[in-house]
């Protein structure tokens, strides 16, 4: 990949990465960071709901680079430094709880007037690969990013060589729902939009969804402040949630996936219980499932070396 073509400059947040704003068409721009040797196998990271690219821990990204990958990470639409979707609010507010309940029992939410769905976000990702002239990549998605990755692998099998899915779901009906303690994080918000309240809320959320006894509050606070300074856009997180709910079950896409697939899930994940990861493993032929003891819905520091090794070994086994 010719980095000079895209005006990449040293990242202001991670010293071993380079950053650029890339126009992918349809008046959309994505903030993209790359790191490692461009001649090495490309690995694309897709992050989850409302989470900027900074939420990929530096040690995780560096571990993948050291394992021999050229790593690409980006802000999804509506978050971070990527384009925001400024669609007018619908006349009647969307009932997110109603959408959650409908998806849980397999009812469609496609009639709800959401700003976009996961299929639109898949096209963002595919167009980014086109723009970067990356014909075939190892795709690793976390949470909502894992849902995007599943659809991408099924719709564009020639673009995805290998698939890594972390603490994600295929939203199959009647899977165990989000636990009440973690559900609060999806239905609440900071007291105000002042930075101290936003940071306190972010720490509160991670204490509930993260790995028990392994949440580094100081690091979480640093990341929340960084996210706030880059771009504070809570509507983007809301529209990400609605994109998931409007899309619904993606089991039919899992059944089309033929690429080697590894699924990694935390034993203590209350936001997306591990049964969701097992459901993906059951739906994707010849996939492998790994349950990480004591891990929640995050990439906590103690688990990063294990996860990096699992992802790297999986690629090498099928290269």
Q: What are these language model-derived features?
A:
Residues 106-107, 119-137:
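Conserved acidic catalytic loop of the alpha/beta-hydrolase fold
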Residues 26-108:
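Conserved HGGG/HGGXW glycine-rich cap/lid loop of the alpha/beta-hydrolase fold
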Residues 270-276:
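Conserved alpha/beta-hydrolase "acid-adjacent" motif
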Residues 135-174:
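Conserved hydrolase catalytic core segment
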Residues 178-252, 259:
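Alpha/beta-hydrolase
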Residues 257, 263-265, 269:
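Short beta-strand/loop motif that positions the catalytic acidic residue
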Residues 3-29:
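N-terminal cap/lid segment of alpha/beta-hydrolase-fold proteins
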Residues 287-319:
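Catalytic active-site module of serine/aspartate enzymes centered on a nucleophile-bearing elbow/loop
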